Amino acid sequence: MHVTLVEINVKEDKVEQFVEVFRANHQGSLLEPGNLRFDVLQDESIPTRFYIYEAYVDEAAVAAHKKTPHYLRCVEELEGLMTGPRKKTTFIGLMP
């Protein structure tokens, strides 16, 4: 299992727009054959900070995800909403 945790910091006045933009990516990702989990989390103490927890069966499924229309559209639309670049950390899932 290949897991990625993505931190996204959003401009204060763009939080609602971020949620709407990311909703389409979330829904599309859940339908991908290699997807095991795709959670969108909002930090309780910093409401402009979001974490995306993505679990895929393997790296090939992750690569396929990054070529999907919903992912590409989301990445493009996020550019004007973020305060800086996304921060990604990858993991090997041992025990789901």
Curated annotation (Swiss-Prot):
Subcellular location: Cytoplasm
A molecular-function term among this protein's GO annotations: (4S)-4-hydroxy-5-phosphonooxypentane-2,3-dione isomerase activity
Enzyme Commission number: 5.3.1.32
PROSITE patterns: ABM
Enzyme class name: isomerase
UniProt keywords, alphabetically: Cytoplasm, Isomerase
Chief localisation class: cytoplasm
Family: Belongs to the LsrG family.
InterPro entries on file: ABM_dom, AI-2_Isomerase_LsrG, Dimeric_a/b-barrel, LsrG
Lineage: superkingdom: Bacteria
Protein name: (4S)-4-hydroxy-5-phosphonooxypentane-2,3-dione isomerase
Gene name per UniProt: lsrG
UniProt catalytic activity: (2S)-2-hydroxy-3,4-dioxopentyl phosphate = 3-hydroxy-2,4-dioxopentyl phosphate
Gene3D superfamilies in UniProt: 3.30.70.100
PANTHER family recorded: (4S)-4-HYDROXY-5-PHOSPHONOOXYPENTANE-2,3-DIONE ISOMERASE, QUINOL MONOOXYGENASE YGIN-RELATED
Function: Involved in the degradation of phospho-AI-2, thereby terminating induction of the lsr operon and closing the AI-2 signaling cycle. Catalyzes the conversion of (4S)-4-hydroxy-5-phosphonooxypentane-2,3-dione (P-DPD) to 3-hydroxy-5-phosphonooxypentane-2,4-dione (P-HPD).
All residue ranges annotated as the ABM domain in the record: 2-91
NCBIfam families associated with the record: PRK10486.1
Subunit structure, as described in the record: Homodimer.
GO cellular component terms, semicolon-separated: cytosol
